Design a protein with these regions (language model features):
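Polar/charged, Gly/Pro-rich intrinsically disordered segments
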Residues: 2, 17, 21, 88-100
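Residue-level signature of catalytic and energy-coupling elements of molecular machines
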Residues: 8, 24, 70
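C-terminal structural segments of small proteins and small subunits
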Residues: 72-95
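N-terminal first-folded block
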Residues: 11-31
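Short secondary-structure junctions
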Residues: 25-33, 76-81
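Extended, well-folded interaction surfaces typified by the phenylalanyl-tRNA synthetase beta subunit core
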Residues: 2-4, 39
Length: 100
């Protein structure tokens, strides 16, 4: 019985990861999604999202938009509680020369 619970948690983590990744790349201003880390806490999932932002984007607004998008997508796809969505902006993609 304990193994079934672990298998279910593994499936849930995979589903949460996929939903979070898809939600992240659909947010305007995200140049690249670098990864998602899922941790299961006592009251729900803790999701860490790593991104590269587009040049000129307001980082606080981008983080807010990603958080909302991820929470909505994960809740809809997996019907699980999301405790926290942490956004880690790992860089900014500069525009190509001549494209400004």
């Amino acid at each position: 019985m304990g193994n079934d619970k672990q298998d279910l948690l593994k499936i849930s983590k995979e589903l949460v990861s996929i939903a979070a990744s898809k939600a992240t790349v659909n947010v305007p201003g995200v140049n690249q999604e670098k990864g998602v880390k899922i941790t299961h806490g006592k009251e729900g999932f803790i999701i860490d999202v790593y991104v590269i932002a587009d040049f000129g984007v307001k980082i606080p607004q981008l983080a807010w938009d990603i958080q909302n998008s991820v929470k909505e997508a994960v809740t809809a796809a997996a019907n699980v509680a999301v405790m926290t969505v942490n956004i880690h902006v790992q860089g900014v993609m500069m525009p190509r020369e001549g494209s400004i």
